[in-house]
């Protein structure tokens, strides 16, 4: 019986390359000359650091443009609150990895509401979709792509 898995993963190599490109642009930008500003990638968190709120927002815009150029979806970024420490302003940007229970339930509901003849089951941080025909599975993929759930999804482990 054909099946595939719906997952939500961020390629860390691409994220690292996007951060490196953003730092390279940061060095050449005129509005950041003489400013203590940086973008760092630690595990699954990108740390933006600057001297003012507006500069942190600009840093995020630079990062978002570089991430989209690398072929990653900007909706995989999770903005957190701006915090201050001394003269610096920080903002952490989380990378969404895996599918949370609530999001998995929304995916299963969207597939069931579409009346496609497939079964969707939540398995940890992924959703397994099985069906009798490959066409049904491709239709289920279209349903998930068209449902605006605020997170990018990849389809892996396609078995016939």
Swiss-Prot record:
Single GO molecular function: nucleotide binding
GO cellular component term, pick one: cytosol
InterPro entries assigned: DUF520, UPF0234-like_C, UPF0234_N, YajQ-like_sf
Record bears the keyword Membrane: no
Alphabetical UniProt keywords: Nucleotide-binding
One Pfam family it belongs to: DUF520
The keyword Transmembrane appears for this protein: no
The organism's place on the tree of life at top rank: Bacteria
Function: Nucleotide-binding protein.
Family note: Belongs to the YajQ family.
Listed name of the protein: Nucleotide-binding protein PSHAa2277
């Amino acid at each position: 019986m054909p099946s595939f898995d719906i997952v939500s993963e961020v390629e860390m190599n691409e994220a690292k390359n996007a951060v490196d490109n953003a730092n390279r642009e940061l060095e050449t930008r005129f509005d950041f000359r003489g400013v203590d500003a940086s973008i760092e990638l630690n595990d699954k968190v990108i740390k933006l650091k600057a001297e003012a709120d507006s500069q942190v927002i600009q840093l995020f815009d630079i990062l978002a443009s570089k991430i989209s150029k690398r072929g990653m979806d900007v909706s995989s970024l999770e903005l957190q609150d701006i915090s201050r420490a001394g003269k610096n302003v920080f903002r952490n940007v989380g990378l969404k990895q895996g599918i949370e229970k609530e999001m998995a339930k929304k995916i299963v509901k969207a597939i069931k509401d579409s009346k496609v003849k497939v079964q969707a089951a939540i398995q940890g941080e992924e959703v397994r979709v099985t069906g009798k025909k490959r066409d049904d599975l491709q239709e289920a993929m279209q349903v998930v792509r068209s449902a605006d759930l605020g997170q990018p999804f990849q389809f892996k482990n396609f078995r016939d």
